[in-house]
Structure formats: C-alpha cells, structure tokens
C-alpha cells in the first residue's frame, strides 16, 4: 500500500478552503480550466448557463428529486458493517465501519446520480443525442438507462479491452437501446474512450450533449458532476447524525477520475475534523510502473480539457495506466482532487490488484455484499487505516458499486482458489 499523506510543510487547509464554486474559468487553485478546441467553447458556456439556471428552477430540482427517489431508489442506506468492524477490532477496541450503499441504486452504482441530472439538462437545452464514455461500463449503463427513460439517442464509447472485461455491461447497454462503439486506439481503455467521445462531440456539437462520467474534463464538468453526486454526502451527513449523533471521523472512497469520492467528500470539505481519504489503483505495484496511482505518482499536465495531475513519462507524454478495475484504469484525476491534495485537505493512497481482490473476498464473506472491484480498493485501505484509529472512531466508506460486473474478472484472477 502506498500513501500520500499531507506533509509538515503543507499549508493549513482552513486558510485555503475551496468555496462551493471553483474560481474564475473553472479553476481549483492551478488545476481545472478549459483546454478544448474553440468549437466546444460555446457548448461549454451553454452547459454552464443551463446548469446555473436549472439549480435555481424549482421545477427542475423538484423533478430531479422526484426521479432520484422513485426511479433511482434514493435515499441509499447507511449500513453498519458489524462483522467487518469486528474483524478489525483490537484488544483496546477499534473503529466502527459504515457503508454508504450506492450499490443499491438502480443500475448498481453511483453513476446514475450524474447521468440522470445531465439528461434532464440535455432536455432543457433541446439536445436529443447523447454520447458518453465508459470504463467499467457502469456510467455507460447509467447513461443508456436514462436515455431509454427519456427517449434520447445514445452512443457510448468504450475501449475494446474494457468491453472484453465488462461483457455483461456491454450487453446491458445494448439491451437498453444504446449503440456501444468499440475503441481500439492506444490501450483500448477509458482514456481512449474519452478521447473518442470528445472527437464525436466536436463534430456534432449542435445536436449532441456529452454526459461526461467523472469529475474530470473541462469546466463546468468537474463542478457539474460533483454537484449531481453531492447527494451522496448530503444524505450521509444526515444519516451519520441519526445513526451515531455526530459527523464521522473518516470518509473513505476509491478514486479513478474521482466522482464517487467527490460526491461523498464535497459536503464535508468545510468540516476539517473529518478526514477525507481517497484510494487509487496501484495495479501490479507503484514501483512496477503498471498502475493507475495518479495522485501518488503523477505530475501536472493537461488531459481531456483540464489541467490536473497525470501519469507522464520523462518527456511529458501521458503514460498507460493499469488496474484490474476498469473503472480506475485512467491516467488522470479530477482537478478538485488534485487541489484538495495540494492544500492538505484530503489524503490519498493506493492499493494493488491483489490487495483489492483480498478485500473484495473479505467483504463478501463477512457482510454478504460483493463490492465492485473499484470499491474494493477503498475497502483494502482499512488494513492500513484501522490499526491507526482510536477506539470509537466512525468510518464511512462509499460502497460505490456492486460487483456483479466483475465476477468473471475475479474468477480469472483467482482460478481454482475458491
């Protein structure tokens, strides 16, 4: 396990606390911005204006909340993982572990929170064609789902390697009426799918809305996706008060692009007593070079329209990322995560494929919940975290997705070990 904890010379986060909105031009400190072809600037401005107007429109928020409840199944429960807590209990006690059950959402992950919100925005803007990128397939499934619900044309770009790993989700998208476009360029994974989706958008910007699936990309996407996912943290905040009478000590979530983590973290950013911990994919090990630990090992650069930390070689070229988890297999990260790391407000670490598999099995056997491989990375961090916490600490983990989609991958990895 690899960690990037705040150092002694890190600025006091309270003095640099981000506001509810990014700074001018979509900046989070030095990160973010809009590094896109001129063709897309009007579309980004239109999207930012539409979102600002929508949040002020009670008809929009009422409809969004109605569908989140009746269609998505919110609010998702905050579940006390009693046996998992007991597993990490020491002789002098230990933390109590709670799961924010985003895996119980319609489509099986947090992704539908954002897909639903952006689909409603697309309808407001009169856009009838929707495109999306997907890695693990969950964002693609969520986008295909809301497009079916609203009668919108849907094209999902997915790397050919990810299509192989996530064949079940490919079939689900097609069953929902979406066109799934295989991307064979580069590593045939999420980065390449995102690049193809952006190319499509440049060509068809007048008729098409791009439902970007993470807190990455050009402004206003990092803000927009974060705000639609903030329902996770807003619910968790109230549920913690109901369940144990106060805010949690630690929030824990996996980080690829970082949408599920930001959705949980954002409503707590001002509460400096709450530790925010994101867990990346160390793949075969950070030292091997085959990983997706962007915050742990990355340097500042520009990818997919935003400045953030990226995995780069010595010449500044974006490196290939690797993770057993298709949803974390990305060489970049959302700009707000990079900023929270810089100011010391959030901590980030990385766990290997093997550590994630071990955690997936542990949670499955102890709690009867099979988490997604992405989510399993957050669970794996408990091995490092729990021994360091005082007795009575409260941990909330974002259980961001269920593991049905990953059963074949896990079976290939474990072979005859089960």
From Swiss-Prot:
SUPFAM superfamilies: Tryptophan synthase beta subunit-like PLP-dependent enzymes. Pathway: Amino-acid biosynthesis; L-tryptophan biosynthesis; L-tryptophan from chorismate: step 5/5. Residues 1-12 have a biased composition (Polar residues). It is an enzyme of class 4 (lyase). The modification N6-(pyridoxal phosphate)lysine is found at residue 111. Its EC number is 4.2.1.20. GO terms for molecular function: tryptophan synthase activity. Keywords: Amino-acid biosynthesis, Aromatic amino acid biosynthesis, Lyase, Pyridoxal phosphate, Tryptophan biosynthesis. Residues 1-21 are annotated as: Disordered. Its cofactor is pyridoxal 5'-phosphate. Belongs to the TrpB family. Tetramer of two alpha and two beta chains. PANTHER family: TRYPTOPHAN SYNTHASE, TRYPTOPHAN SYNTHASE-RELATED. This is Tryptophan synthase beta chain. It comes from Synechococcus sp. (strain CC9311). The lineage of its organism: Bacteria, Bacillati, Cyanobacteriota, Cyanophyceae, Synechococcales. The gene is trpB.
């Amino acid at each position: 396990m690899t960690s990037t904890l705040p150092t002694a010379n890190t600025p006091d986060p309270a003095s640099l606390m981000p506001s509810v909105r990014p700074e001018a031009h979509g900046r989070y400190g030095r990160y973010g911005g809009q590094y896109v072809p001129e063709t897309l600037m009007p579309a980004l401005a239109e999207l930012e204006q539409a979102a600002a107007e929508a949040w002020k429109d009670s008809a929009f928020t009422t409809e969004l909340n109605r569908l989140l409840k009746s269609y998505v199944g919110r609010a998702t429960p905050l579940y006390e993982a009693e046996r998992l807590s007991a597993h990490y209990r020491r002789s002098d006690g230990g933390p109590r572990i709670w799961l924010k059950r985003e895996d119980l959402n319609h489509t099986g992950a947090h992704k539908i929170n954002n897909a639903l919100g952006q689909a409603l925005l697309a309808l407001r803007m009169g856009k009838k064609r929707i495109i999306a990128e997907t890695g693990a397939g969950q964002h693609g499934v969520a986008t295909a789902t809301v497009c079916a619900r609203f009668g919108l044309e849907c094209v999902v770009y997915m790397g050919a390697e990810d299509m192989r790993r996530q064949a079940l989700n490919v079939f689900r998208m097609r069953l929902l009426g979406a066109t799934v476009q295989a991307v064979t360029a580069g590593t045939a994974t999420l980065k390449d799918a995102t690049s193809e989706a952006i190319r499509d958008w440049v060509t068809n910007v007048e008729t098409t809305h791009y439902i970007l699936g993470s807190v990455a990309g050009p402004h206003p996407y990092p803000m927009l996706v974060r705000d639609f996912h903030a329902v996770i943290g807003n619910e968790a905040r109230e549920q913690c008060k109901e369940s144990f009478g106060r805010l949690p000590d630690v929030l824990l979530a996996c980080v690829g692009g970082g949408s599920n983590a930001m959705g949980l973290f954002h409503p707590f950013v001002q509460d400096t007593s709450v530790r925010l911990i994101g867990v990346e994919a160390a793949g075969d090990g950070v030292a091997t070079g085959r990983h997706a630990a962007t915050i742990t090992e990355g340097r500042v650069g520009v990818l997919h329209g935003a400045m953030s930390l990226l995995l780069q070689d010595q010449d500044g070229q974006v490196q290939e990322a690797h993770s057993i988890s298709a949803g974390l297999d990305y060489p970049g990260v959302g700009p707000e995560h990079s900023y929270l790391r810089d100011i010391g407000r959030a901590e980030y670490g990385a766990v290997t494929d093997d550590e994630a598999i071990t955690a997936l099995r542990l949670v499955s056997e102890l709690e009867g919940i099979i988490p997604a491989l992405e989510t399993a990375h957050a669970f794996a961090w408990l091995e490092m975290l729990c021994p360091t916490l005082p007795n009575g600490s409260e941990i909330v983990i974002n259980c961001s997705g269920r593991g049905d989609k990953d059963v074949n991958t896990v079976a290939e990895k474990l072979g005859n070990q089960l």
